[in-house]
Amino acid sequence: EAFYRKWLSDLAADQYPDGHVDHVIPAILENQKSSAAWGDAACVCPWELYLAFGDENILRSQFNSMKKWVGYITSSTTTKNLWTGGEHYGDWLGLDAPSGSYKGSSDEDLIASAFYAHSTELVMKAGNVLGEDVSEYETLYKNIVAAFQETWPVYHTQTECILAAHFHLAKDCQAAADQLAKLVTDAGVQLKTGFVGTPYLLHVLSDYGYVSLAWSLLLRENYPSWLYPITKGATTIWEHWDGIMENGDFWTRDMN
């Protein structure tokens, strides 16, 4: 808890006046850009700490930073009530990435808009805990959800399904979860998710009636899986699903 409190204080201190959050905190690199999911740590991390420890002070100390981040998105987007036009990492290292790309094939604007909604909702929740007036964010959140549903009525990748269901953005979240289960099954009970979709994958499957499928993914040892790195002697989390490849080769040093 103490580590993350300190890190979040660094994030707030390094946050730009317009709410921009660099993708490395402390901000030791030059010419950084904000990216959906990365910058959303300004809202996600305080809320997760609050859920873990129940201490309102973490929300109180980060509340202005949380609001500034949502304000940054609102002021920088090219489409009202969505987050479009930015440059993002997308579903980084998703296994459905086009040839020659590190970004998974999920729609980057969909990912960004999903996290816009999520961070706005977290500001609402934090404000309610703190007794703050969050009516502005309640209206914004409703508008984002409506725009999201109009713009993306169907989902084509595992990560798109995951975000639509987990953040309750789809008109029919069960249908989005059903599509996710089909995509996983059709892939040979394999995940294709990257940085964005992976943390929520098993939650969505479990929450929407696919517990057995979630267990099959979790306990899988062949690449790609959570246990595959352990079979190769890993003691930390790799950036790539195959930091050591099946033939024993390593990724280049810029990645691991």
Model regions and ranges:
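Active-site core of glycosidic bond-cleaving carbohydrate-active enzymes
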Residues: 1-256
